[in-house]
Structures are given as structure tokens and as C-alpha cells.
Amino acid sequence: MTEYSSLSGIFFHNWVFIRGVPTIRFLPPEGPPEIAFAGRSNVGKSSLINALVRQKSLARTSNMPGRTQELNYFVPDGFSGRPEDLPPIALVDMPGYGFAKAPKNLVDAWTDLIYSYLRGRTTLKRVYVLIDSRHGIKKNDAEILELLDKAAVSYQIVLTKSDKIKSSVLEQRIITTKTKLLKRPAAYPEILATSSEKAFGLEELRAAILQTIAV
């Protein structure tokens, strides 16, 4: 078990990119607990990761949907990678799904990569599924949730871009989302609302991640 208190400053560390994984055979050896971020293309995964670790350009952001085409691994800097000196956590930025304009063979490759990773990674502690707060859970999102349920992978919903809607609309979105999760066995019941642009909800997300890897 990792001590929660000893990790409290981890998001003040400098973080670095260590590996891009284009296919499942390039995955790094299983080591530290992994926290993955999944979501539709352009939902704001890379922006949220940057805001989470207080670095503007750690994860590459783009207005072009489908920019993230690999599993991108990030860890706190300063660890050697030796078994006795592994980083306490790795963040994984997953390829966005639901991008219809990409070539079919590319979409198929992304889909296979996502599904293979989610099914077989024992060090994966939780997937944060990012949902645009303006739109709620769409068909592609529901398909990922179904996969996570079947694979018994713990996941939690994070609403992004929450500053783009009125607070009353956001409150209703949270209620609606909670209702949709009631019959999903792998879903963590608490919904997190965030805004990368306004730094809203980030402390709650950091705390949730730390509690997850401390178990």
C-alpha cells in the first residue's frame, strides 16, 4: 500500500513524457499504478492532464480531433526506472474515440489498442472517462462504459468544460449522469465536474486519484 500522505505533493512535481504506445506490444513492463484518461476526440483529455499537473504543454493539445493516436505515458520526473526506484504513479492519455473523419484502418487500430489495454493491464487502477458536460453520455461513451463493466475495470466519470454551461444545467447533468450509472457495476458513483480553462474541480480530481492509488 502506498501512503496517501507521502503522495500529496506529487502533482507539484515536474512531469515528463516517457513513452508512446502505438500497439499493445510496445506497452512498458507493468510497474507503478496507472491512471488512464479516456474520452471522445476533442473532449479535452490532454488539456485536463496538463492542468492536473500544472504544466501547459506536457500532453500535446490540438483543436484537431484525433490528434492523440497512441497511449501516451507520463510520470513524475526524477525516477530511475529501476524496480527499486519506480515512479509512484503513471498517467496514461488514451486515443480519443468517436472521431468519424479518420481513415477506417486508423480508427480500427485505435479501437484495438484501447480495448486490448483496458482488458489486460493489471496495474491499471482506474480509468477516468471524460464526458463533455454540454452533451452528456453519447453512444460511443456508453460503449466504452460497457467494455469497462465487462472487464471489471474501475472507472469514474469526469465532466469536462463545465464552465461552458450554466450551474443549473451542470447540476442537472450530474444528476442525469448518476442515474445512468446506477446499473453499471464498475462505475464509481461520484461524478467529478471540471474545467481545465478555469481550474475548476482539479483539486477534487487530484484527491480522487491519490485515494485510488493509495489503496
From Swiss-Prot:
Mg(2+) binds at residues 46, 68. One of its GO terms (biological process) is division septum assembly. Residues 31-215 form the EngB-type G domain. The keyword Hydrolase does not apply. InterPro entries: G_ENGB_dom, GTP-bd, GTP-bd_ribosome_bio_YsxC, P-loop_NTPase. Keywords: Cell cycle, Cell division, GTP-binding, Magnesium, Metal-binding, Nucleotide-binding, Septation. GTP binds at residues 39-46, 66-70, 93-96, 160-163, 194-196. Necessary for normal cell division and for the maintenance of normal septation. This is Probable GTP-binding protein EngB. It comes from Bartonella henselae (strain ATCC 49882 / DSM 28221 / CCUG 30454 / Houston 1) (Rochalimaea henselae).
